[in-house]
Amino acid sequence: MSRYDIIQSHMVFGGIPYYLSYFRKGYSFEQNTDMMLFGSKPRLKEEFNRLFRAIFTNAEDCKKIIRCLAKRNYGFTREEIASATGLPLGGGLSDTLTALAESDFIMRYSPYGKRTGEYYKLIDNFCLFWLKYVEQNQEDATFVNDNFTSDVMKGWRGVAFEQVCWQHIQQIKHALEIGGVKSSISAWNIKGDETKAGAQVDMLIIRDDNIVNLCEMKFSGSPYSIDSEEEGKMLHRLDMLKDTLSSKQRVHMTLITTYGLIHGKHSGKVQKVVTGDDLFM
């Protein structure tokens, strides 16, 4: 497989060798995914349920949490999870969240700009894809082949690529030449009001050398081009973030995209570019 197809396989299957072993030579990524997950008798027809039964004694509670977290990319607080799932807010929920985190289904993080409270975020690509598309469309034997580049799957492609980036933090830091700089990783979401639109940043690398990498992650089948509308959105997020920083801190606008950036009149604010190849370092 090409590196582009390997990234796509991570977006759907999380790069798990067990799943990738079913890929058949001579077939495209889309065709292989259809054969494994869609149609009347796909190889992984009951994989979502089988996976949780095999790992957890309280599989149903775990699936409730995963279904909840799949609804919002930046995640939920423990209290929000309890409310959405009906699970008691107590030690049992804490133990289940810990077990899911230790098994790499979810991650726990502290959102930038919030002094208290932790969020839980779904990071398992297979679960995200299953809940988004497989459950509702499994009988459609050519679903991925017919829809992968269409608007039907556009939103998911962006979110899934972001998940892959979160799973390759060390490679991203290495590409930025900051592997030895102490840093924390966070997401940031700020609500707007009547005078100003809100902003959502899917990855911040907050460094001890007083630089913050504001990371924009874009999945693309070709070198990425920034138009005037996208530039405006990026500048808005940049300005909103700067308002929260100290006078000592600087922001480096960082683009992470599969095939790099086409430099043009709207790309001037981008200071660092990380490519798909960098994720293999």
PLM regions and their residue ranges:
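Amphipathic alpha-helical "lid/sensor" segments that cap RecA-like P-loop NTPase cores
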Residues: 1-51
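The alpha-helix within a helix-turn-helix
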Residues: 10, 80-83
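Short amphipathic alpha-helical interaction segments
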Residues: 86-103
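Winged-helix-like regulatory helical subdomains adjacent to P-loop NTPase cores
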Residues: 29-80, 152
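Non-catalytic, well-ordered alpha-helical scaffold segments
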Residues: 4-7, 17, 31, 63, ...
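A cross-kingdom feature that marks ATP-driven nucleic-acid transaction machinery
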Residues: 111-112, 118-281
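A short, conserved structural fragment
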Residues: 101-112
